[in-house]
Amino acid sequence: MNENIVIVDAGRSAIGTFSGSLSSLSATEIGTAVLKGLLARTGLAPEQIDEVILGQVLTAGVGQNPARQTTLKAGLPHSVPAMTINKVCGSGLKAVHLAMQAIACGDADIVIAGGQESMSQSSHVLPRSRDGQRMGDWSMKDTMIVDGLWDAFNNYHMGTTAENIAQKYGFTREQQDAFAAASQQKTEAAQKAGRFQDEIIPIEIPQRKGDPKVFDADEFPRHGTTAESLGKLRPAFSRDGSVTAGNASGINDGAAMVVVMKESKAKELGLKPMARLVAFASAGVDPAIMGTGPIPASTKCLEKAGWTPADLDLIEANEAFAAQAMSVNQDMGWDLSKVNVNGGAIAIGHPIGASGARVLVTLLYEMQKRDAKKGLATLCIGGGQGVALAVERM
């Protein structure tokens, strides 16, 4: 790239709990609110956008190309193309990479990229219903589990991959609960200090009676969480296991997006860049330990950027599970005081198609607050992959 490609604005919805405040809205409706909010904040006209690229994992029965639905619902003209991508938990960050590539290749000037997800509205389906079932029980499948949370190669839940990591690294239940409690406590402190306020775009949720409800604060964090309280929970995936609902991320709803363009375009439009996109990398690992994906992805990304872990001022590494996040921290060897300083997905939540963009949005705003220069966003991916993006404030 001969010219810097930058993010000029970033925003996200507050993250909703499963069947919680956002559950009455589809993924496209949540995404529409965020996209409209970004247009309003930047002052960009809808017709100035060249493309919209959004991650969404749970798309069964939601209609053709959800990103296109979001684009038109947000008031962008028919002439603006849109693409939905599915790289499971890495979808929202890969969308930003695709925006970066499109601009670098001269295929677009301004791209909005990110992700959206309603895990609450994911469908149950009846397999082989076109052929019929002549005898016996006929079971429906939960697409949230099958398409979002189930390892297709080993035929078990993502939680089992976390158990595999805990066994491989020797992480105890107590260590995992302590990690999860710390995440909750950091998020509680951040919420009480208003540290997420700037990044959240409020969403109006229609009510059956009266005025719409304004949803503008993450509702998944459990204030007052301690390692002792987490220690009372039963293992979720194995009778003798150590992974519980308390030391794993949540099932959530939300959306997050960024506005990407060249530095010269930002200057032309009078928009101040939040950061430049420095490098991106994807990597593959054994699906049975999919949570280690950020290790090779982050290593490759840092090599491309010409950085080392010690150069990073701030890191957002998605917490799919405590054991998973601990393995990444251990092998990367980075300064833990710089990682997920306001808590991670164990506390904030993990709307899978949106999380890649969510960690990036959170990273960008916290870098501003701390005057940090170099940052990294990274996530593991079900099926055995990882993604990482390096950014630098200018």
UniProtKB/Swiss-Prot annotation:
EC category: transferase
Pfam families noted in UniProt: Thiolase_C, Thiolase_N
Compartments, record wording: Cytoplasm
Keyword entries, A-Z: Acyltransferase, Cytoplasm, PHB biosynthesis, Transferase
Principal location listed in the UniProt entry: cytoplasm
Keyword Transport: no
Molecular function (Gene Ontology), one example: acetyl-CoA C-acetyltransferase activity
Keyword Transferase: yes
Coiled-coil ranges from the UniProt annotation: none
Pathway: Biopolymer metabolism; poly-(R)-3-hydroxybutanoate biosynthesis; Metabolic intermediate biosynthesis; (R)-mevalonate biosynthesis; (R)-mevalonate from acetyl-CoA: step 1/3
Catalytic machinery residues: 89 (acyl-thioester intermediate), 350 (proton acceptor), 380 (proton acceptor)
Reactions mediated catalytically: 2 acetyl-CoA = acetoacetyl-CoA + CoA
GO cellular component assignments: cytoplasm
Gene Ontology BP, a term: poly-hydroxybutyrate biosynthetic process
EC number: 2.3.1.9
UniProt family annotation: Belongs to the thiolase-like superfamily. Thiolase family.
SUBUNIT field: Homotetramer.
Protein name: Acetyl-CoA acetyltransferase
Organism, as annotated: Allochromatium vinosum (strain ATCC 17899 / DSM 180 / NBRC 103801 / NCIMB 10441 / D) (Chromatium vinosum)
Species classification: Bacteria, Pseudomonadati, Pseudomonadota, Gammaproteobacteria, Chromatiales
UniProt gene name: phaA
